Structures are given as C-alpha cells and as structure tokens.
Amino acid sequence: MQHKFDELNINSTSGQKQRISSYREYFEVMDLPEAELEDRIRLAEELEPIFIWLFLLIVGGMYSKYTMQTMLQERLTLTIMGFFKIEFLNTYLQSYVEKISEEVIRVTIKNASDDYYTSVNRAQFISANETNLLGNYREQIQAIENGFRFKVWISEGDERVRHTHKAVDGTKIEILKPFIVGDSTMLFPKDISMRPSAKETVNCRCHLRYTKY
C-alpha cells in the first residue's frame, strides 16, 4: 500500500483541514524528554519556512515539478543532516526525502485552487508531522546504539487517539520487530519503511518507550 505523507491533511473524523496552535503545545503532550522536546520544536521551526517557500514557488508557476522537487530535496537534506548531526543521509532518510518531496508537491499542485494548501497553517501542520517522523526515527537509532532490546508503544490516551492505536497501546516487542497497527506495520509511530496507510500515520502523536529488559 502506497504511503501518502500528506493525504490532503484532513482528519477523517472531523473532515476539517488540520491546524496546530503552536509547536510547543503540539509536542508537549507527547511526554518527550526536555532535550528532545526542544529539538523537535527547533526542527519544526526550521521546516516551516521551507514549505512556505515551496508553496510560493508553486503559486508562482515559474518552475517545473522536477525542478521544485530537486530544490526541495536539497533544502530538506541540509535541515535533516543538521537534526541528525550527520554529513550524509542514510538509505532510509534519502528515501524519505525523495518521497515527501514528491508527495507534498503533488498534493499542493492538485489542490492549488484551495487556499489552505498553500497556507502557513498547512506548512505548520506538515512541519509538525514530519518532525515527529524524524524524531521517532532518531530515537529508534539511538536506542539500538545504546543497547536497548525492547520497545513499548505509547498512545496519548485521549479521545483523539484512533482505535487502531489504542489497540496497540502498551504493547511490548523486540526492538527490531514491527508493530502491527490496523492494516499497517511500523517499526515506530509514523514509520514509512513498510508503506503504511496514511490513516495510521497522519497526525499520529504516539511515541515509544525503550527498555533493556
């Protein structure tokens, strides 16, 4: 099943286009360590102007889709390398940059007549969501490097949590095995490597707790 990073950014329960009030408020509910919280806020703030810039390019209509994808990939690559403190992207991150660049541009062009799709609100929503994916992936890498052997899926436990995520809340598995979430499999919340359904990833606020025993 092909993953749709953006999936029009519509909440299937409300049918309304997604907005966030602030990055701090969005991430604080996830019970992240303070350093991780600040890192995610910083990354989202760095991603936001990149997507706003992209929307302006699309509205201006001066560049081909291929040219915009290339430019977007370059900007995302530099930002992600800074977040991970690396000099080159690994295969997972390279694939991620290519897919999100293609998908966000495709959806924006398709819906360019709707002001929301080129708005600051949408840029913020995408930035927050993609920050969570990148943050969750970084945590998984760090946990493996630090010798953790197991992981536990943690949902936010409120009325916004989708039932398929409630079903795996508290599930503990070996660190390299995937979770089965609805009709999808994921190594961590928002993981794209196994082509999950967008309904299981878009606006997901779940996180993992890693343990050695």
Enumerate the predicted regions with their spans.
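Acidic, glycine-rich two-metal-ion catalytic cores of nucleic acid-processing enzymes
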Residues: N121-Y213
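N-terminal leader/targeting and assembly helices and adjacent pre-domain segments
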Residues: M1-Q142, N146, Y210-Y213
